[in-house]
Regions:
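Cys-dependent protein tyrosine phosphatase-like superfamily
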Residues: 1-85, 99-146
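Short cysteine clusters
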Residues: 89
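Conserved G/P- and acidic residue-centered "switch" motifs that form tight phosphate/ATP-binding loops
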Residues: 92
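Ser/Thr-glycine-rich phosphate-binding loops at phosphate-binding pockets of nucleotides
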Residues: 96
Length: 146
């Protein structure tokens, strides 16, 4: 999270511009941004011209399939349009890992278990709770029908 405890100077945010980022998938509630970053990140991103896909999830939790599917759909639409996208939660492991796994299910055709293994191979420690694993598996089952 830019300006959070792992990036108090906002160096990550500076990298957004260096890497031509156009959109942000924000996976934390607005209140959590205030607690950890001391500001309304969603409003800042929008004010600075970034497109925001907001899928607020509590720490170690997930989201229901309809909201998760809508956020995945919107993220993939933005990517197909040529937008560079960054996604983040607080530490970049649980909720970010969950969302990345769901993108992999959709784009790579992975099963839920394979998507969890895939993201953990790339980012050790990703997907931090049993509930997050369950959400990923349910997304794979639900999404296979779309």
């Amino acid at each position: 999270m830019p300006f959070g405890q792992y990036d108090p100077l906002g160096q990550v945010y500076q990298c957004f511009w260096k890497n031509d980022i156009h959109a942000v998938v924000l996976l934390v509630p607005d209140a959590e941004c205030w607690v950890y970053a001391g500001q309304d990140l969603r409003a800042r991103y929008q004010r600075d011209g970034l497109t925001v896909v907001h899928l607020p999830m509590k720490d170690y939790r997930g989201a229901g399939y309809p909201k998760l599917r809508a956020a995945v759909d919107e993220t993939l639409r933005l990517a197909r349009e040529g937008n560079n996208i960054v996604m983040h939660c607080h530490a970049g492991l649980g909720r970010t890992g969950l969302f990345a796994a769901c993108l992999a299910i959709r784009q790579l055709g992975l099963s839920g278990d394979d998507a969890i293994e895939w993201i953990r191979d790339l980012v050790p420690g990703s997907v931090e709770s049993d509930e997050q694993e369950k959400v990923i598996r349910e997304f794979a089952l639900e999404d296979s029908g779309t």
